[in-house]
Amino acid sequence: MRRADDGSLILDKGLVPSKTRRIRVRVKMNDKVTGTSNPVKSASSDDESIEGRILQARDTLFEEELFYELVREARILGPYGVSTRQNLIRFPVSEEQEVMLDLADADQESDEATDESHEHDVLADSIGHSIRILLTFSHRQNLYRRTQPPPPLSQRRRHTPEYLLLRPVLVYLQHNSHVRWFESFLKDMYRLLKSAGVDCDYTATPFASVDLQHKTRFPKVETLIHAIFAPLESTFSGTLVTPKSSFKARIRTNVLGHPFGTNHEIFMNMPHHSDIQAPARMGLGHEAAAVLTHFIMLDVVSAISLHRPQGCLAWEAAYPHHGELLTTSPTTGGQKKKMKFTLARNEMTVQVSGIRGTGVDGSQTWKSDQTSQQPSLMEFVADVSKE
């Protein structure tokens, strides 16, 4: 910047980027762009003024540094699905959704503008704001380190750690995806149980570990950053079929500590199967859903064996882990009928046959999306248990 002959200020054009550049965030769902971040507005009202051009250069420099640090971090996140190619960073959120980040001109339009929707614009904007806040926080951390006494001199070159920019975003998106999937599973399962006349319910507390209202001595921005870096945890609890039977589930996603990623834990309270517990830690939501489905099946088998209306045959759980029950005749003591119970996410079936499998005495199927009126589970059991 220098003075012209008339005393006005002149900014050397060679020092100012020819175009404003920004980080563009796009969200894809099933190979279709469903969200794009909005361009960052300049702080100056007049882009042609000296002040406006200086602010443009500052913003472009910030965006270029941000993209450089994003690429630097993305190179160590290959095992988590993050890939870089030329001027593009992309990573999957779920099987259907992925996020793409690139450094583009502010006035550049997307190549897929004709197919774009705006369903996930808010998500794209949130990711863009998050990575900018995290870079600013990293600058603050660098300033703090420079004010501290330097470490002892060493011949080893000190490695500059990658900034935490993508990892907190990855963890949040991954945790949110796992929580939404598990909650949809519970919704289907409990809708199925209620369609069979079972009185039970569940409670979901997504992001139970996040408490931004808690008062601390830190500024609000740092409190937000500390909440982003902390492990994310969501909890679920619910009642089952038999009295006093219940479950608790916890989904935990870690940012910094080991193990990095999402783990599922299930805790069962089943008085009739107190010796059986779920695996300590499961990495996949499908595994946790399969374990919980099996425990619900065990509880339904226990409820059927405890249900003994007057004048009906009593059922005993012969092979509870396979959903099989047998009934005996009160007069002869011989086994008369066999019941096979199967349970899936959207369907529950009870089939009763002779002990030797010679014929089917009755069968009933309940579905989570059924609309027609059907007998309840215990009504069907009582009906097929008549002598």
Name every feature range the model reports, one short phrase each:
Residues 1-84, 88, 107-387:
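Glycine-centered motif in EGF-like
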Residues 85-89, 93-97:
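Core residues of folded domains in eukaryotic genome-function proteins
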Residues 94-98, 104-108, 256:
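Conserved beta-strand elements of beta-rich interaction domains across eukaryotes
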